[in-house]
Swiss-Prot record:
Alphabetized PANTHER family for the sequence: APURINIC-APYRIMIDINIC ENDONUCLEASE, ENDONUCLEASE IV ENDODEOXYRIBONUCLEASE IV
Source lineage: Bacteria, Pseudomonadati, Pseudomonadota, Gammaproteobacteria, Enterobacterales
Signal peptide: none
Co-factor note (free text): Binds 3 Zn(2+) ions.
Protein name per its UniProtKB record: Probable endonuclease 4
Enzyme class (EC, first level): hydrolase
Pfam families registered for this protein in UniProt: AP_endonuc_2 (PF01261)
Statement: the UniProt record of this protein carries the keyword Metal-binding: yes
């Protein structure tokens, strides 16, 4: 079964997110459990936690259908000790919030060396950060997202993801999320079925499908191998419809959240309906 949805707003409180997902016909969703552009957030109260869990039950969302995302401020590979500690503390808090809400996944961007560390040293620092956070929390898997490779961001090569996983001690609590726009911008072609098969065979060889915990389904305004992160609506960018149809028909992508972060929330319901139709080969674009 495919779990298909979008990154919905948690404005007004996390308990509002499940209903917003249900309104667009989603069978999965992503959210921020706090303001993603602030370091601090009010603690989750028992009432808020209960409301969120009740809303998930009401709308039929289990933990495996929900892919929370951490704050954009966090850099688990930061070269400066003070900033690194701040990021690590924030990441631990994000994992703890997910656990409180009964969630089992937390999607994060690996980190940036800021031109002050080698790639290898930064990847090791990221893995160390993950180990520290997993040691201080329970029940939530840290899900590394591939990046487009803008600036000094790491995670744009499958080898980066594998290097982090290799150094994480508890392999049962680490996974990856593949963003199609990021992969395309990083030089992994997806424009034809043959491209998809080649790219994901490479992913399986280097990382392994056993670590795939989620997907971000985004077309790209950015050009191939540009290392620029610019999302677009499905079929309107430089990737096209083909990979999204292909993903819907492959069992490797069953039972994980498949999340839209496309640029027009007004058509998310249409994009979700189109994706659902591709599972049986219907609704050609």
């Amino acid at each position: 079964m495919k779990f298909i949805g979008a990154h919905v707003s948690a404005s007004g409180g996390v308990a509002n997110a499940p209903a917003r997902a249900a309104e667009i016909g989603a069978t999965a969703f992503a959210l921020f459990t706090k303001n993603q552009r602030q370091w601090r957030a009010a603690a989750l109260t028992p009432a808020v936690i209960d409301e969120f869990k009740a809303a998930c039950r009401k709308h039929g969302y289990g933990p495996g259908q929900i892919l929370p995302h951490d704050s954009f401020l966090i850099n688990l590979g930061h070269p400066e000790p003070e900033a690194l500690e701040k990021s690590r503390a924030a990441f631990i808090d994000e994992l703890a919030r997910c656990a409180q809400l009964g969630l089992t996944l937390l999607n994060f961007h690996p980190g940036s060396h800021l031109q002050q560390l080698s790639e290898e040293a930064c990847l090791s620092r990221i893995a160390e950060s993950v180990n520290i956070a997993l040691d201080k929390t329970e029940g939530v898997t840290a899900v590394i997202e591939n990046t487009a490779g803008q600036g000094s961001n790491l995670g744009f090569r499958f080898e980066h993801l594998a290097a982090i996983i290799d150094q994480v001690e508890d392999k049962s609590r680490v996974g990856v999320c593949i963003d199609t726009c990021h992969a395309f911008a990083a030089g992994y072609d997806l424009r034809t079925e043959e491209d998809c098969e080649k790219t994901f065979a490479e992913f399986d060889r280097i990382v392994g499908f056993q670590y795939l915990r989620g997907m971000h389904l985004n077309d790209a305004k950015s050009t191939f191998a540009s290392r620029v992160d610019r999302h677009h609506s499905l079929g309107e960018g430089n990737i096209g419809f083909t990979p999204f149809r292909w993903i819907m028909q492959q069992s490797h992508f069953d039972n994980i959240p498949l999340i839209l972060e496309t640029i027009n929330p007004d058509i998310w319901n249409e994009e979700i309906a189109w994706l659902k139709a591709q599972q049986t080969g219907g609704a050609q674009a």
